[in-house]
């Protein structure tokens, strides 16, 4: 009955790896004593995957790798011919000829913020070998909204050099807890430990005091304080926000330093991280017999929004995520959450019971571990402030795109920020979280040099800077030294609005623009000594090759791809994937905004660059090149670009218009099961990519020959979803192995196999035959071609189905022997969200939906237009289950609604059933 143990045994045997392996120990690192197998499914679950052909060393690593189990949970990808039932199929259902809309099971308000574009919730399955659990399975939604909390703080000011040997102290007192005092001592010679060095340089005194505070963080979550230096001042913050923590200060530093008045913390009313259980609820008969889910917790965790995806611990009791505090920068949280009515506001307790009344807990949050009664622990580690800027104690950068990746084998979390730094935290979930040190943090993407502009002009709303440009939309740039020129209408107020840190809205190789409120339009300011200083490149989410090299792959917003060792050293020369000559054409729409996907078995990976001048496979009418799908190969010390495939015909203009990010591709089920190593295209899987812009959205499926991506799309098809400008969500694939058929007959020509059965399969379903044997009418070589391989249904009726295959000799008479023969299979789906054409969640069958003439819309058997506002975040899928509402997808809306999750305008957490798809 235990599916994964069976999967392990068959896989090891199939590859000659069984000797010396105890298959009962497969997954021994996290299988519970009772045999139950938990599987966390977060953003990283689909970033590292394993296909047929893995090595013994990779098999050993997979024993303790939850992402392998998540893959098998969703695919069951044993090798062809193994005889393994790839997933536990369901009883037969009536023959499927049509599919209706996807139905909403439930939608719950997230308040003033939703899941950020391109990010996704995280789902925890308590035991994938059992019926889905109403109480133990849960989903976590990050909320991209500020909480309204404030951190208690106090400002200290230096006016000179304090006396050596004097002290200053900060005391933190949690409500109901024990006060903890941090005492620092001034020194003219020592700048380590609790000592901070002082001199006549006043600003350095501030930096040294702040740095001393930051290197002496408390070991308990509620007692942590940090400090930010700015000029001659030091601002100390209690990391735990709200009224539950108070700050007091003391100082004997004398007249050259003083503390100001303490500003108390404040409690907000907006959650930035929430979780639900009783997921399998909804109208009609549901597994949980409820109408709505229940909140496990609703937390206002810190001050700032959570703009990226969370990661889950193996135990399912902890969550890691990044908060962006406007004063401190990015902060990694490791949250051990509580449960019960103390973990959400009292005003929502009465409607958090799964009934018909929608719960409103997202706007009634508590501060984890601080609000009275909360049993949570919220451990916070400021990233840039404490780790990258340890010496200067200036505020760290935010984190816009980099989600934390948990390497479960070492309990190390990797995460990046907008200044090009990659951080490592270990332990994360098994002890008190701590900075790893060593090479970390490592600035993998270094700050570009300052440039001299040749012209700056402005309307009243847009500033145009003429300068040699390598920036990307969304990256920061600092303009300095611009002065007034009254002859050209450039006034002092104009200059005040132009100088400073700006965010580019459009660019070319020779100029950039940014939006600003300019008092008067100008034809040119004075630029003597003026500089344009790019900010460092934003990092994407890091991905660790947990099944192979153990190396880290991370990209940046200028389309560079890096490979680092687990120790933070450079493993291979970086790839500049957006560069043509000296011009970076990848620097638009965030460069490589999404993390890589790593095929650990085959030693290849994939990224999507927003604009790549090297793409092949079609003519492009765009001026910058295509949005490009790049395949790369890697070893422990090499990184090589293999193939560049265009994702956009040029009509959609993804490469010349801001606001349309591109995301990583997704393999189809055939890729997982068949791999990509065959020299014959038909024996390999496919990978699907998408691009969007002002002219619509395009999907493309690409094939493989001998592990190399073929840059011409499958059958030269380029389906166009629509022609309206629309953001597009990341692609989500899910194979539903829903059918188990008893085969009553098999006949074949040399090209077509006909299977007789009480058929419930549909055209384009994927199927595997087993148990077919030879006889006088059917040769052994015929049987070898019929059994085991993953096939695609070409025609289907209530009594039979066919698939194409190369059969050595046509069968005769009654065909092959089918005693005990079965066919298992089902549909392979692709989910994608749009905000135009119309706004909907679309479902496509793979590969058939994409095999249409160029420019035509793909075949979309299922959609949902009622429960999408402004498009969707990325999606997470859960089970392949027959239980009511237990086979679903989860996402957030990108805009507010007054109909989807209540009548009060709000962003929504949505669960759609897959029942209509099956």
Placement of each model-derived feature along the sequence:
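Boundary/junction segments of secreted and surface-exposed precursor proteins
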Residues: 24-48, 106-115, 124, 150-157, ...
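Intrinsically disordered, low-structural-confidence terminal and linker regions
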Residues: 9-13, 17, 21-94, 243
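Bacterial N-terminal signal peptides that target proteins for export
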Residues: 1-11
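Mobile, glycine-rich extracellular loop/lid and propeptide segments
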Residues: 28, 87-149, 234-236, 258, ...
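Cys-His-centered catalytic/binding microenvironment captured across papain-like cysteine peptidases
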Residues: 529-532, 817-822
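Generic detector of N-terminal low-structure segments
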Residues: 5-6, 17, 23, 516, ...
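Extended, beta-strand-rich, solvent-exposed assembly scaffolds of outer structural proteins
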Residues: 150-267, 298, 448-528, 739-815
């Amino acid at each position: 009955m235990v599916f994964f143990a069976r999967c392990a045994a068959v896989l090891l045997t199939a590859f000659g790896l069984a000797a010396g392996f105890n298959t009962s120990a497969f997954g021994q690192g996290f299988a519970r004593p009772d045999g139950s197998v938990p599987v966390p499914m977060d953003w990283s679950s689909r970033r590292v995957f394993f296909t047929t052909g893995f090595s013994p060393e990779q098999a050993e690593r997979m024993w303790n790798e939850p992402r392998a189990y998540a893959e098998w949970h969703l695919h069951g990808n044993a090798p062809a011919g193994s005889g393994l039932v790839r997933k536990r199929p369901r009883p037969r259902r009536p023959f499927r000829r049509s599919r209706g809309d996807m139905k909403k099971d439930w939608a719950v308000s997230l308040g003033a913020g939703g899941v950020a574009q391109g990010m996704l919730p995280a789902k925890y399955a308590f035991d994938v070998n059992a019926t889905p659990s109403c109480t133990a399975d849960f989903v976590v939604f990050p909320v991209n909204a500020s909480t309204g909390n404030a951190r208690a703080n106090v400002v200290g000011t230096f006016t000179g050099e304090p006396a050596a040997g004097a002290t200053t102290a900060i005391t933190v007192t949690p409500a109901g807890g024990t006060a903890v005092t941090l005492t620092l001592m001034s020194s003219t010679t020592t700048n380590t430990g609790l000592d901070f060095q002082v001199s006549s340089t006043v600003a350095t005194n501030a930096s040294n005091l702040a740095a001393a505070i930051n290197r002496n963080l408390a070991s308990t979550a509620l007692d942590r304080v940090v400090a930010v230096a700015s000029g001659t001042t030091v601002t100390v913050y209690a990391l735990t926000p709200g009224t539950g923590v108070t700050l007091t200060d003391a100082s004997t530093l004398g007249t050259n330093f003083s503390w100001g008045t303490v500003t108390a913390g404040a409690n907000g009313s907006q959650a930035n991280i929430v979780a639900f259980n009783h997921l399998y609820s909804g109208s009609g008969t549901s597994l949980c017999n409820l109408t709505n889910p229940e909140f496990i917790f609703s937390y206002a965790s810190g001050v700032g929004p959570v703009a990226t995806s969370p990661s889950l611990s193996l135990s399912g009791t902890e969550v890691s995520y990044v908060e962006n505090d406007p004063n401190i920068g990015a902060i990694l949280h490791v949250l051990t959450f509580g449960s019960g009515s103390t973990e959400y506001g009292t005003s929502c307790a009465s409607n958090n019971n799964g009934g018909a009344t929608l719960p409103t807990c997202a706007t009634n949050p508590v501060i984890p571990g601080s609000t009275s009664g909360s049993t949570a622990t919220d451990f916070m580690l400021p990233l840039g402030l404490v780790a990258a800027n340890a010496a200067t104690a200036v505020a760290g950068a935010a984190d816009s795109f980099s989600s934390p990746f948990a390497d479960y084998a070492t309990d190390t979390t990797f995460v990046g920020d907008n200044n090009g730094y990659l951080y490592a935290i270990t332990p994360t979930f098994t002890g008190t979280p701590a900075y790893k040190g060593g090479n970390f943090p490592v600035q993998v993407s270094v700050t570009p040099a300052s440039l001299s502009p040749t012209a700056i002009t402005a309307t009243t709303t847009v500033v145009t800077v003429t300068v040699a440009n390598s920036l990307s939309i969304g990256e920061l740039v600092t303009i300095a030294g611009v002065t007034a020129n009254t002859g050209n209408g450039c006034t002092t107020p104009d200059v005040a609005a132009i100088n400073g840190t700006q965010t580019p809205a459009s660019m070319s190789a020779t100029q950039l623009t940014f939006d600003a409120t300019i008092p008067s339009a100008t034809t040119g300011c004075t630029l003597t000594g003026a500089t344009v200083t790019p900010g460092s490149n934003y990092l994407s989410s890091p991905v660790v090759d947990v099944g192979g090299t153990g190396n880290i792959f991370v990209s940046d917003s200028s389309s560079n791809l890096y490979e680092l060792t687990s120790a933070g050293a450079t493993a291979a020369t970086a790839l500049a994937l957006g560069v043509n000559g000296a011009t970076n054409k990848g620097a638009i729409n965030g460069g490589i905004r999404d993390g890589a996907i790593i095929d650990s078995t085959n030693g290849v990976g994939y990224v999507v660059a927003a604009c790549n001048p090297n793409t092949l496979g079609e003519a492009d009418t765009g001026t910058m090149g295509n949005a490009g799908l790049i395949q790369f190969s890697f070893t422990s010390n090499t990184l090589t670009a293999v193939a560049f495939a265009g994702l956009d015909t040029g009509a959609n203009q993804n490469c010349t218009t801001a606001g349309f990010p591109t995301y990583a591709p997704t393999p189809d089920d055939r890729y997982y099961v068949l791999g990509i190593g065959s020299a014959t295209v038909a024996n390999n899987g496919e990978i699907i990519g998408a691009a969007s812009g002002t002219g619509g959205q395009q999907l493309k499926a690409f094939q493989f020959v001998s592990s190399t991506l073929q840059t011409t799309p499958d059958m030269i098809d380029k389906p166009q979803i629509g022609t309206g400008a629309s953001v597009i969500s990341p692609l989500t694939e899910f194979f539903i192995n829903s059918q188990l058929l008893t085969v009553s007959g098999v006949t074949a020509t040399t090209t077509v196999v006909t299977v007789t059965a009480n058929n419930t399969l549909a055209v384009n379903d994927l199927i595997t035959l087993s148990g077919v044997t030879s006889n006088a009418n059917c040769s052994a070589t015929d049987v070898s071609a019929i059994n085991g391989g993953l096939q695609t249904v070409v025609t289907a009726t209530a009594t039979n189905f066919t698939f194409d295959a190369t059969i050595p000799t046509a069968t005769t008479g009654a065909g092959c022997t089918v005693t005990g023969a079965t066919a298992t299979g089902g549909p392979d789906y692709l989910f994608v969200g749009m905000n135009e054409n119309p706004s909907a969640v679309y479902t496509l069958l793979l590969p058939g939906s994409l095999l249409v003439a160029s420019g035509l819309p793909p075949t979309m058997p299922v959609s949902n237009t009622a429960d999408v506002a402004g498009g969707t975040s990325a999606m997470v899928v859960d089970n392949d289950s027959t239980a009511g509402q237990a086979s679903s997808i989860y996402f957030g809306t990108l805009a507010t609604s007054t109909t989807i999750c209540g009548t009060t305008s709000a962003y929504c957490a949505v669960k759609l059933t897959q029942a209509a798809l099956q």
